[in-house]
């Protein structure tokens, strides 16, 4: 009986939250009030994800100082990767769910210039990575990114690009990607998170990947009919310049520093659904557009890029959900029996959320980080 009473108490609290929460609504509310409260919620959310106790103080020189090109390159690559993954659903593991809340620091590591570019080897300085990342960092995601340049692919032809971990006789197959003419001037990404985790925990000073085309037994070795930007052998000043170009093969790495992953919060990732935007005639749960301007709405000058973003929010009534699939149906029925005049109506809540990459600075130090679950893309009744 005590357990039932506790569950009923929890449901009463749930109803109160539904009536007052600004992210989700169970009844019609003043939209301006919802907007103001949503903006204030975002203020606290961003500071919390960055583990900042308060807004950073503005350094006038830092505000006008130009962001280094290397950081802009990292930021642009992060934005591109986020856009590519918008419609990709990746089943989340328990570890992924636990680390999803806090902002991820983003680092970009270009490949080392190698004498073996003709063999399509991509080498990385692991000592440099360990020096930059430190030892107590939780690796969240690592993507090997290659910019495809069309060389001899015909309209109706394609080649399968195979990625191997290691080079030479020790190379081990990881995954592949089909490349056709439509991939010209586009980035191909390979998830190499597990491999990077193992390399970072090891002691090797240099590690690499190898690119190959599949070999059919008894047939001549197939030639690459496309090029990968930055892998051609260059000389002199041209080589030095190429090493700094954003089109060179690189690893984009997102991680949690020790002070963030020591107190992980669990946030559940959900499968992507279609985006349902509210209209003037909407009478059910939907996404209402809301643009947040960091300077105008929050009074912040310490976020350099972007200047704002569409945070959006969920609003609209939800009908009662009484079905066998709802694991709370029996508890709700019991609650309804003991409280015939009360309501345990479901709320309109976010279903799919997307990340927001930012460049911000504390004092005169610029950083690139990715804030998870910042953009509401679809809603559901729950």
From Swiss-Prot:
Any GO BP: positive regulation of cell division
Annotated spans, Bowtie tail: 218-243
Residue ranges annotated as motif Cell attachment site: 235-237
Pfam families, A to Z: TGF_beta, TGFb_propeptide
Residue span of region Arm domain: 69-264
Disulfide bond annotation, renumbered to this chain: 278-286, 285-348, 314-379, 318-381
Tissue and organ expression note: Expressed in blood leukocytes, kidney macrophages, brain, gill and spleen but not in liver.
Record note on quaternary structure: Latency-associated peptide: Homodimer; disulfide-linked. Latency-associated peptide: Interacts with Transforming growth factor beta-1 (TGF-beta-1) chain; interaction is non-covalent and maintains (TGF-beta-1) in a latent state; each Latency-associated peptide (LAP) monomer interacts with TGF-beta-1 in the other monomer. Transforming growth factor beta-1: Homodimer; disulfide-linked. Transforming growth factor beta-1: Interacts with TGF-beta receptors (tgfbr1 and tgfbr2), leading to signal transduction. Interacts with EFEMP2.
Name of this chain's protein: Transforming growth factor beta-1 proprotein
Native organism: Oncorhynchus mykiss (Rainbow trout)
Gene name in the database record: tgfb1
